[in-house]
């Protein structure tokens, strides 16, 4: 789902889960994005726990759309929730760079894609192992 500033259909995990349940089709599931959840949810971790069974794809995105761990997302609780639900779907890092014109990025969030990948990966591995 998207946050309330980018969408009017649904803007939180519970609304999206209810919509997916109402559609009731095996090909309609949830793609969860921590950037939007960080705006809309009281607890991103609790939202993950509530919708996990209908969520085959989670986009891990920092509040700045930059390197994971360098913003305001509560990663320990998010990673704990992912572990708690025995999540086995896709975990994808989503970040925006100046190379994506449609994102209207006006400042650099990382120096290179390589830095983004290396630092975000190391952050995830290090912090997931702590749980």
Regions found by a protein language model. Name each.
Residues 1-2, 95:
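Residue-level "edge-of-site" marker
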Residues 2-8:
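Surface-exposed cleft-lining segments at the edges of enzyme active sites
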Residues 10-32, 37-131:
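Histidine-acidic metal/acid-base catalytic patches
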